[in-house]
Amino acid sequence: MKVLVLALTALLPCLAASSDADPDKTLGSPNAPIRIEVFSDFECPACKGLHEQILPLLMKDYIIPGKVFLVSREFPLRMHQYSREAAGYATAAARLGKYQQVADTLFLTQVAWGASGKVWDTVAKVLTPAEAGKVQLLAKDPTVLSEVQRDVDAGIAAGINQTPTMIVTHGTSRFPVAGAVNYNLLRSMLDGLLK
């Protein structure tokens, strides 16, 4: 996922915030014709697959060319013991512009920290000591905790009951895409919407 981080660095002028999304949790132009909100859980194996396999393809084919605006949403499932903690750290890191780096490492090392419970140790490895101190404080901040809960509430309101779930919006039409995603099918859907 280092390639993704490098691509994001090159895209900084293109990255923009939606009025209801943290700017560091979005990719692409908010003026893109398609908006995809990805509700994911850092302990979810299918979310890991989406992040590591599908997201780079979406970046290349749709986000960089300005066809898709992607918003990352936290949806920690109760069945996953450490996912809410991970979501809190990732959301706190977003306040410092470090969301993608933290998300990348959480997904990359999901099995290890999911078994050990050492979420913080995993997150701290991709932060400077100064950033780590700020993220630890921010993760306890009520505004960060409420941001995670807002994502969860938005997902529940949209009828989401599994991760990953993508809500694809084109104009006034919204299409849920739940579970593990086949990129060729997703691509067909997006290309159909763009016609």
Positions of predicted regions on the chain:
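Bacterial N-terminal signal peptides
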Residues: 2-14
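Processing junctions and N-termini across compartments
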Residues: 10, 38-41
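A short beta-strand-turn-helix
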Residues: 18-34, 62
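Short clusters of hydrophobic/aromatic residues that line enzyme substrate/ligand-binding pockets
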Residues: 27, 113, 177
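Structural alpha/beta surface segment adjacent to cysteine/selenocysteine redox centers
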Residues: 32, 40-125, 158, 192-193
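Conserved S/T- and glycine-rich ATP-binding loop of Class I adenylate-forming
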Residues: 36, 44, 166
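C-terminal cap of thioredoxin/glutaredoxin-like
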Residues: 52-55, 122-195
